[in-house]
Amino acid sequence: MSTVEEDSDTVTVETVNSVTLTQDTEGNLILHCPQNEADEIDSEDSIEPPHKRLCLSSEDDQSIDDSTPCISVVALPLSENDQSFEVTMTATTEVADDEVTEGTVTQIQILQNEQLDEISPLGNEEVSAVSQAWFTTKEDKDSLTNKGHKWKQGMWSKEEIDILMNNIERYLKARGIKDATEIIFEMSKDERKDFYRTIAWGLNRPLFAVYRRVLRMYDDRNHVGKYTPEEIEKLKELRIKHGNDWATIGAALGRSASSVKDRCRLMKDTCNTGKWTEEEEKRLAEVVHELTSTEPGDIVTQGVSWAAVAERVGTRSEKQCRSKWLNYLNWKQSGGTEWTKEDEINLILRIAELDVADENDINWDLLAEGWSSVRSPQWLRSKWWTIKRQIANHKDVSFPVLIKGLKQLHENQKNNPTLLENKSGSGVPNSNTNSSVQHVQIRVARLEDNTAISSSPMAALQIPVQITHVSSADSPATVDSETITLNSGTLQTFEILPSFHLQPTGTPGTYLLQTSSSQGLPLTLTASPTVTLTAAAPASPEQIIVHALSPEHLLNTSDNVTVQCHTPRVIIQTVATEDITSSISQAELTVDSDIQSSDFPEPPDALEADTFPDEIHHPKMTVEPSFNDAHVSKFSDQNSTELMNSVMVRTEEEISDTDLKQEESPSDLASAYVTEGLESPTIEEQVDQTIDDETILIVPSPHGFIQASDVIDTESVLPLTTLTDPILQHHQEESNIIGSSLGSPVSEDSKDVEDLVNCH
């Protein structure tokens, strides 16, 4: 494997052979990527290595295209100290002009949120004076300021919201309360006197700011929607009657006090709507320059009282005046240039160069200075919000990860200019292009322990797949239902699901493969030789291939087996920590040999398995950088025990003892077979975890294959499930799947946009 390390928490995998995850003495997870030493060896010299090979193919011996991306799944034990552990993975496979692009990108980002650990109420006894002060008087504020205290203001970052929600969950759990609204809206001040001070731990904000944030989050009246004309009229009447008694006005309208206050502030009887007239624009410019003592053509973005401006303009609200000036008129008068795609890329790079941990730390005034195509600092920030929205889960990842993802997108576009040309400015796919792009992002969600199914807490798998499919004129369109039989130990296809999870049903051994829609696929694991998947959906070139490995065979066989596939894949192998010595190579990784197959909680005995050897001897092996269709057709019709690939790779790099210091903790394969414990990933309640907790990782990879290399005890390899999405398998000319581009329409000015699946 060859890797490029940008930072300590990111590894971009270029050529994958095998990956090993271990844990050091401090509990940190280490991703070991042995160097591929056989890259330059001609594979033709060693087409038939003397290992027993297991060919993975469908029951009709259907040959799978080289471009088929494959995803391997493995259970990874995490201790209770890893509650903030997050894994984000991104894979992009590109095919243009019927040829596989060699620049296939796989990015693995393993994040340990150290900030959460440092400020956790359980691990930090020192409480910030700021987070324990209400700031009810100016004297309180001045007192803390004179003592050198500083605090954050403005928009809340994702990290701050995560800390706040984590604190609230801990508070509720410690007191046996199910719903936070009981405390916020029903309890008296005496009953909840310690609530806000407790949940403010780790936040460098005054209590009043925390209080207002919590009210906005939990008050449903803040999310009622747009005011109707009838509500506006009633609001005007209530304002005349009750003045600034916002609580009374809000109660009468069924809205929060802050909502009616904001609406009244922007409400004006004489306001025009729609397009501005030339007279209005001229009047706005004159008023702004008059109130700020500036000359026409000067850039004015700060120090403007928009309430005073609106009063002088007379026909527009303060919000309308502010938006018109900052987003258009000031830029037009100062002779600014148009915003281009290069400007968007430059914005990403400039923000990355700032090296800030939070986007709220960005000084937009300095960033916009001297940039002729930037209309105002506020407009530039709005443009940034538009750019980051192209990462579908931008709200769920940290700011540094978001920046790295956007930089990776920039690099992909730079290396593949045709992709940039094929994308329209609005981000809508160009149906005339013959390029197909698949993008998958995977997250790990913890689940509440369900003792009725398993004795160990489980983490379920959720795979949101962002796919835009533009059918060509001759693309097939069938709507027939289909029933697919999955033979254990083989590969089969069924319709791709935008997102799915396994939901236990009332029948033992039966799970419902739930999609985001109302449809579902019943998946039954029984003693019969087959598993039947029924899909009431049209046949599609977008497919998933499932391959199951039984843990029974992993433990009870001693045959040397090299698993070779001509589909790209990665296996992450977990290593028992008590067996890691101070100096160890990959060939010496072992686990406790006392674990027997009986330890598993009723594994399906019908599933055949690929077996991993107690010891594998390595001859001189080679790699062919690319193998053509002739190699595929040569082996595609052979049975399941014959060679499918003509390449072998040997990894020999020693892993230093500093990379492999392990924390003493037990390894229990009995809890590694977790199929029967999978639950809905929508439940993400934090629970006390043990070292036997399971988290499922999915690792997409570029072209390569699995090789059980070096000397690895069979029990150190956990049961696998392989999900392959041969999206480009037989329909490269019939489907066009691309992600969204940076070219999105300019968003409306918004003050509360607090928002990674990179759709490329």
From Swiss-Prot:
Residues 176-760 are annotated as: Interaction with CCND1, CCND2 and CCND3. Residues 1-237 are annotated as: Interaction with CCND2. Residues 306-329 bind DNA. Residues 87-458 are annotated as: Required for DNA-binding. Expressed at relatively low levels in colonic mucosa, ovary, peripheral leukocytes, prostate and small intestine, and at higher levels in spleen, testis and thymus. Expressed in multiple regions of the brain and CNS including amygdala, caudate, corpus callosum, hippocampus, substantia nigra and subthalamic nucleus. Isoform 1 is the predominant isoform in monocytes, macrophages and neutrophils, isoform 2 is most strongly expressed in peripheral blood leukocytes and quiescent CD34 positive cells, and isoform 3 is expressed at low levels in all hematopoietic cell types. Gene3D superfamilies: Homeodomain-like (1.10.10.60). Its main location: nucleus. Interacts with the D-type cyclins CCND1, CCND2 and CCND3. Interaction with D-type cyclins may modulate transcriptional activation by this protein. PANTHER family: CYCLIN-D-BINDING MYB-LIKE TRANSCRIPTION FACTOR 1 (PTHR46380:SF2). Belongs to the DMTF1 family. This is Cyclin-D-binding Myb-like transcription factor 1. It comes from Homo sapiens.
